[in-house]
Amino acid sequence: MNIFLKVFLMFILSSVTFGAENRIDLDLRLEPKNEKNFYLLKGSFINKKVILFEGNTYKIVRSQNELFVDEYYDTVLQSLFNKKASLRYRKRFVDGVDSKNLIQFKTQIDNVKIIGMNEFKIEINSGDTFVTYRDFKNYINRSKNKNSELYKQLRSYVNISKLEPMFLVTQHRDRFYLQDNDGKTIYTISFDEVIYSKQLLKKTYFVIEFETNETIMASADKITSDALVKSLNEFVLNLDEGNVLFNRTYDSKYAVGIKKLGIEPKTENIIEIILIFFALFSIILLFCVPMFYRIKVNHKM
């Protein structure tokens, strides 16, 4: 239908930083049933120096005062949302200082089973600043970025020229790193206080994310990665047996934002029907107007 439609419309109109990274982002998320539960769990981690995790002892290292400002992009048809993917421009601040800017593209590894996300990144050069969406678009279309894995993957999901800003997200993050005896971070637990914004509408959201180290997951063999996933899953389940204080969620922050802000995704079929109707109406006008004119002239004669 798409090919037919394009040809059809053409007929009517003629008549009238390099350095992207590929990682596996595996996280488990809990939504607190109320704000109190969120802060109670965070407090329990603040007061601990070490934690026993599936028979292993990990040192807890806290990182706080992180602020993320994210702008999400998609097409008018919300093609990325429908394909369980997301694209964002992220600015990261630590203690109020801009520390890192990057573009992130995430895709679900399996469309049926939720087993993690593929993550592709392009780090923004310190000298580059985005004031408008056009700046973002120009940057991602630079020659060096077109050779990145992010660009190649994104292009396979969506027509990049059709991307538009969807909404803004600000989130305050308190993060706890679980490190082994060698000082290597194996797991990360993040407490996120999120505000979704679109025009004058604002919605709050609290979520706790439990993640394995992205780099370790990307390089690990299947046995090791399965063991890490199993340990993390059991740890999260034991935190709240019976889901008394929290609900397990599988929605990405982008999907949550779409729902909380009430942005209804459009479907290609509806758009195509409208365009086809317009095309047919134009065809009728092209053929009927001359016909009526000839009839009128003949009638006068």
What are these regions (language model features)?
Residues 10-18:
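Hydrophobic h-region of N-terminal signal peptides that target proteins for export
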